[in-house]
Amino acid sequence: MRVTSLSLSHFRNYERALIEPDAGVTVFTGPNAQGKTNILEALHLCCLGKSHRTSRDEELIQWGRDSARVTVKTAQRDGTHEVAVVLSRTQRKKKTVRIGLRQAERIGELLGHVCGVLFSPEDLQIVKDGPAERRRFMDMQLSQLRPAYFYALQRAVRTLNQRNALLKDIARNPSLLPTLDMWDEQLARVGAVICENRREAVGRLDELARAAHLSLTGGREELRLRYVSQVADAPDAYEALLARLSRARSEDLRRMTTTVGIHRDDIAITIDGKEARTFASQGQQRSAVLSLKLAQLELAGAESGEAPILMLDDVMSELDPSRRRQLIERIDRVQTFVTCTDLSDLAGARQGAVYRVENGVLTRT
């Protein structure tokens, strides 16, 4: 897959912009706080239907404007495609998606049309932070590649919220207790779908990340990933989740919240058998995240059947020369969008399009 054009209208600090990227590397350079990251954010919006920086879509609309639009055109094996995301402050529907000439009924229909992997300095939190950050990493990867997973995840969140609301209602009205069985069954059923997808994906990412990390470290360190779940090893995830919910019912009723399930999942990340979050140095943690992102890129290509785009947001300056060289070797294989303040960070990379960014204005150099 190759992005042939990206157009922005009233998006963040861009009045209007048209980008015709190189088939290889396209670089956006300039001082900080000029709008470089906003371009990658626009691409990410067309990949996943949401920003990687904020959950508030209205923040993406240019100040003083009622709406914003991002359009991406791509060339793929089966022809050319176009997707557009329109955000509005004033319309009843705040976000709409167009796929070609058709308006999508659901945001999830966007998934899979533009496949991309974003790597930013904030991704270090995948290793450093708690389980929620690693679940987010899993869910964003799988939602993009498997729309059915995205819809299952939406159902799981709704069902969990409804079960938690019922637990609070039961505290006030114990006669509602029998209705809990229905929600347990629904939560276990959709949870099993999530669990099985996560288990399989983490297994594949483990192999790919391990190989990438061995290459990055010259064979000196072994990175491993392991899916951590209350039912990770169960042959039947549905039955195991249902049993866990049954055993936890008294505690759930006492605390008025669901204490077991997929919302407690995690990925254990280890280097040479030691937990990377606790025992790895900052440099080792950066290497681990880079290996994860390279694995994510490989998995996305294998699952989608198309080479995904790679978005690098000011990460070159964060890497030492060895890691930078390893990453540059790999970006030659896919279409890559890079933001940086200094072009020397990309020494050795294949030359492509370069845009100078100043206060939301792009100049191709």
What are these regions (language model features)?
Residues K36:
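Conserved lysine of the Walker
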Residues Q125-I126, A132-D181, E185-A188:
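Long, charged N-terminal accessory/stalk domains
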